[in-house]
Amino acid sequence: MKRDFNEFKEFIKGKNVAVVGIGVSNIPLIKFLVKLGAKVTAFDMKSAEELGGISKEFEILGVNLELGKGYLDRLTGFEVVFKTPSMRIDSEALVRCKNQGAYITSEMEEFVRYCKGKVYGVTGSDGKTTTTTIVSKLLSQEGYKTWTGGNIGTPLFSNIEEIKEEDKVVLELSSFQLMTMDVEIDVAIVTNITPNHLDMHKDMQEYIDAKKNVFKYQRENDLLVINDENEITKNLDKEAKGKVVRFSSKKTAGEDAYYKDGKLYVHGKEVCKKDDIIIKGMHNVENYLAAFLAVYDEVSIESMKKVAETFGGVHHRCEFIREVDGVKYYNDSIASTPTRTLAGLKAFEKPVILLAGGYDKHVPFEPLAYEGYEKIKAIVLFGVTKEKIKAAFKRLEEEKGIHVPVYSGESLEEVVNIAKSIAENGDIITLSPACASFDMFKNFEVRGDKFKEIVNNI
């Protein structure tokens, strides 16, 4: 049951509130809390100089700042603590606050708790952003006022009083955001679950349990959309409290949405042809099937078809950059796991020269080698994981006698030059790293933008 936001306004007014992390989502949150009458202290590991103008702006607003080395040691004596999504609830600082009686929450939890509009929550190891965007496009096409947030779009909590009951709200939710989520989400979509973020989660089970929170607090009238091809998600119906619908790109029996003979179907009705979908690849067929099921009660088949035939995709997802000397370059920087890279490779009709590597999330790379070799003409590695990926391809050669040429470089510029030097007329070069970007770049967008800049300067 959605609660009246006036309750929150009364609760937060005059409270001594800590906000951990001065990032994209927390900057508007801090300003909003000040507006609601809270006494706010903002915490961040960066210095005032590193934060730039925002630190001065906060000082003018009366926000106390606790910055730099040891900043979490000073997180004590607060009535309310808004944590950053990646901060574990069992961290020493938060355990200390909880023992002191603090209410610990996050921007996303409070938003979902008080949001009047119907909430669609999208999670999964791969396909979250594209599926979230498709759901938003479908609802907008049908004429609904649609708000998009979570991991993408703009932070929504500060806009909560503008969102009406008839509005639709589509959220991309990460495992970090879901770990402490204990509120009802009207429509939950789980695209797939494969090993991911094992550098942050204690183990795979904790990661799975976090994902389950997207539907754990649903009631009988709510909806759960699951991937019937994924070994983990196909069994989630056993724990569901609401209605469950399934999608599959490989089988039709018992499926609520499926792909057959080049066409996509939802609840037995043909929606569109695969060849008419602008964004290519079977992973995008699955993203559409999931989205169609999520909005089936609100969106017409005509609107579904229109979006599929006009939506050109999201930046950094199998994004065509340019063709140089007969070689096509694609940016798939979003691919931060081996499974997402495999899905991207399947979108191409011929083997590609793959640029891969980056930050180590402690996931195995054998699937990339053993399942992807037919789609890889050569692989050029960079980043912290390059030796780990190289070892997976070496194992493939030793065990199966399958040789994939492996090259490596130190920088993105160097690997692009290596790929360019081995490419022939008609080849495809794609950046699809199978890893996060944090060893060399702030995020996958910065990595993708740098790649595009390099390619556009060839």
Curated annotation (Swiss-Prot):
Pathway recorded for this protein: Cell wall biogenesis; peptidoglycan biosynthesis
Organism encoding this protein: Clostridium perfringens (strain ATCC 13124 / DSM 756 / JCM 1290 / NCIMB 6125 / NCTC 8237 / Type A)
One GO term of the biological process aspect: regulation of cell shape
Its job: Cell wall formation. Catalyzes the addition of glutamate to the nucleotide precursor UDP-N-acetylmuramoyl-L-alanine (UMA).
Gene3D superfamilies for this protein: Mur ligase, C-terminal domain (3.90.190.20), Mur-like, catalytic domain (3.40.1190.10), NAD(P)-binding Rossmann-like Domain (3.40.50.720)
Binding site for ATP: G124, S125, D126, G127, K128, T129, T130
Name the record gives this protein: UDP-N-acetylmuramoylalanine--D-glutamate ligase
EC number in record: 6.3.2.9
Enzyme class: ligase
Reaction catalyzed: UDP-N-acetyl-alpha-D-muramoyl-L-alanine + D-glutamate + ATP = UDP-N-acetyl-alpha-D-muramoyl-L-alanyl-D-glutamate + ADP + phosphate + H(+)
Chief location category: cytoplasm
